[in-house]
Amino acid sequence: TEFPVPVTVDGSPAFAVFRNSITKTHTINVGVAVGIPVNGGNVSPSGGESKHWGNTRTLSDFYDMNGDRYPDVISDMQVQYTKPQGGLSSLKLGHNILGSPLDTTSFNGVSSSFGASFTLAKKVPSTKKSSRQHEIGGSAGLNGCSGENWDEDEHIWTDVNGDGLPDRVSKTGKVFYNLGYSFVDGGLFGSCGRAGSSKNIGGSADGGFNYGLLDSLVVPELKKDDNSEAKPTEVNLFETSISAGYGFTRNINNTDKMMVDVNGDGLPDCVQRSNGVLNVHYNKGDGFLSEETLLSDEENLYTTLSTCSNINGAVSVGFSLGCFPIKFVVNPKGGYTRSMGKTEVQLTDINGDGLPDYVTSGDIGHMQVRFNQSGKANLLKSVTNLAGGGMTMDYKLSDYMGYDCPNRIQVLDSLFVYDGLEDDWNDTMRYSFEYDSAYYDRFERTTYGFGVVKTHSLNSNRTIYRTVTERYSNRFYKFRNLKTYELLTDGNERKYVEKFFTYVPKEIATGNVVNVETAFCFGESYPALNREEVLYYDDNENVRIVTRKHYKHGPFGNLTKYTDAGQAGVTEDSIIVTMTYHPDSANKNLTGMVKSMEARDYRDSLLRKKDCDVNYYYGQILSLRQYNDHDTAVTDFEYDTFGNLVQITGPANSQNQRVIYRYSYDSVLHSYPVRVKNVPFGYVSATAYDLRIGKPLSTTDINGNVMTYTYDRSGRLISVLAPADTGYTLRFEYWITYGDTIHQGDNPWARTSHFDIQYPDNPLNTTVIADGLGRVVQTRKDAEVGGYETSLVSGVVDYDCFGRAVRQFYPFTDGVLTETYFQSNTSNGLASTTTYDIMDRQTLVTQPHGVKTTMAYGFGQKGGKWYFLSSATDAKQNTLTTLTDSRGLQVQQTAPGNTVTKFSYDPLGQLTSSTDPMNLTTTYTYDKFGQITERVHPDAGTDTYEYDAAGNMVSHTNGNNKTIQYHYDYNRLTDVEYPDYPANNVHYTYGDSTTNYNGKGRIVMQED
């Protein structure tokens, strides 16, 4: 019976399949025993030999045959697969493996035994006149045995090629690769099945002594019926015996060869004992490498020891009372047995890093471990680029996380980033990392990573400068690796910025939120970002500013509503954007085609609106409409059969003229635009490409002027030729070209040569020198000083260990004409220095001779609301203070003399008013295209502006109610009409498509 997934009914039946195997053994025993009489006793020596052989063959077993990490049932004839969430399915497939497909182990052994026993029994009269006799006896025995056994795998299942599926390998090295639902003959891989041996010895010794007192008595009760005299009867009056014995066994099992992943690459390696050392053949995926020594001072691979010893003794005393047939026996006895079994040598993972360690145990209560040093193998250690910069990494074994994640892994412990310059500032960037809250999902059987990661930026003395703490969702499969939290703190753990990200499961088909408290599983859902919140703290760790964003989704994960609430407690900066989507009418899985979009403020006033028509088969936008108060701007698009945009028709102007641009593409790749035509005016520009690197070889403007470009083999620009020049206009050289040899200490540079028409053979060169991280540290320019050619060198830029520019030397002249030479030591030593806070904001700039400018940051209030505050104080103690809102917009500026200027904005960030220190306010009004429509100035009065749908300003009315009219030919201004004085009117004439002398598209005449 198959049940749906997930199973939603209780009491679903489950069926168990037995693991079966069969063992066949053949045994030959040979033995001999002899009895020899000796003076009233008997001596019996014995001995024997035994030999056995056979095999154990598995008939049915469990292996994950298809890689779903659920065990499937395999037998001689077929494989029965399990379902994705457990339980047997009805899928049964036969396999094509020749011979016995399951595990087969052969074994053989020999054993020897020996023994000897002695017995003695005598009767001795007490006296010549007495009828009593003494009965004396004794016995002794000695036995021993020894044996040796060997076993070896004939066929095994193991994943030899690292694809996660068990393959079948035979003793001869032949492999059948598992393809999940069938097998393929892989030829010879290499032989390395398990092989082992065992030795055992045993022995025993025992002995005893007995004594008895006998007498001949006439028992009255035994008189005969015929009244004749009864004959005497021998009666045991007293008897005693003493016996003792000792025995022992000792068994040692050794594994001589086995497969185990020694180096952690996911491939089982072959480890074996050989000549007193442990050797390994590393698995390379398609066979084994040659033998290497794993441990030269160890010879055991896997050893178990079991011993058992016992001692026993007994005393027996018996006696009779007179002639009565009653016997009393006292029989005290005792014994002691001691047995022990332990593993003396084992390859097993002790520290939880997933790698086998070598563990030995000689004495009870003591264990020695040789940890596997392969944990960092194959982990990236360092990267060095051609410029000498790079980074080095080190790793450590993660802490044990307990039940939530019992596995330990190698994690990044430290990261050093260096720029490759030896003579500059101490600027190596150092980071260390901490991890916590790892989680292992036992249902999915995979680790979801760490829930908490801390990144520490370190000072040059390795102390913590600042820390970024990040939290990730790692409890559910669909939510894994999503960041839910971020916190910035300094070295004293003082908070600066805290961020929260909230994700919820939403149904793919509807966008509805899944109730995680009641849902059996999340079903067809996805993790959707539902909310963002950012908190900003002051110096006392009080929250001063909070910003929030909210997201709402529809079907297929489409965002249907976005709310930027801005700063908490401030409604004026809130904006709500709603979106609708086109249906997938053509069933092309094009579910994310936006149909319309609206933006509104907190009063529900419309700020922006647009919608579009699309091609349902290809998802192409055919028409885009943007709505203003009285106009609608329509832009149309056309495409070719390759999906390239071939025509754009812009919005109509006031005369209903629409600009049209047509695009043509290359005929090989159909990807690069090679021709652009302005249809109304007939202007054409062209571009030719090097299709190998996708870069232009030449561009021709609408006047026929050609710019030519050349590149090196690495695709870097090496020359530019302007239309009026010959040879080159700009030439570019680089510190390394294709095939060059890199020399240690070379500084990366790039040189630009400007052609100088007055000195054709001596171009003006500018060389930029960078460090190994690509940061510019110096610039050298050709210059002439006092009639001599020299270099004007910019001061070196030094960076600190956080990548910030902290020192800038002043420029100087350098007689060294080697333009690529990096001059780290300046002759004048003049430099400006800069210090920063935790958030990389400048706090102090010191110019040469001690001139300082200080900056401070915090929070300030305006109108009862908190804002970001920054201040700058110059050397004369003049301070400029600025208040900025959560969007980064300046809301107030206080200049020296306590002169205050204030600014206000709408939700779109458009300036709506500015109030000067005289408390005079200028206001601004915008249309739904973002164009200013009105400005009210305290002196100039009210200015109004009108536009057509194409965005051209068609009129401007000033504060005196005088209107200036603007006229256009498509999108080109042709006439300006002023009020009252027509003589001031202006008319512009443009060059048409036939105009010469670079006049096409340009103003060739102005009439006013």
Q: How should these model regions be labeled?
A:
Residues 58-65, 153-160, 255-262, 343-350, ...:
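Beta-propeller blade termini
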Residues 379-384, 391-395, 402, 411-419, ...:
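Beta-strand elements of repeat-based all-beta scaffolds
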Residues 67-76, 162-171, 264-273, 352-361:
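Acidic/hydrophobic-patterned starts of short beta strands in beta-sheet-rich repeat architectures
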Residues 65, 74, 160, 169, ...:
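Fold-core signature of tandem repeat domains
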Residues 29-46, 109, 113-143, 205-245, ...:
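Short hydrophobic membrane-inserting alpha-helices and related fusion/pore-forming segments
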Residues 1-14, 78-101, 173-193, 276-297, ...:
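Beta-propeller blade repeat segments, especially FG-GAP/WD-type strand-to-loop junctions
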Residues 50-60, 100-107, 111-113, 145-155, ...:
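Repeat-based blade/solenoid architectures
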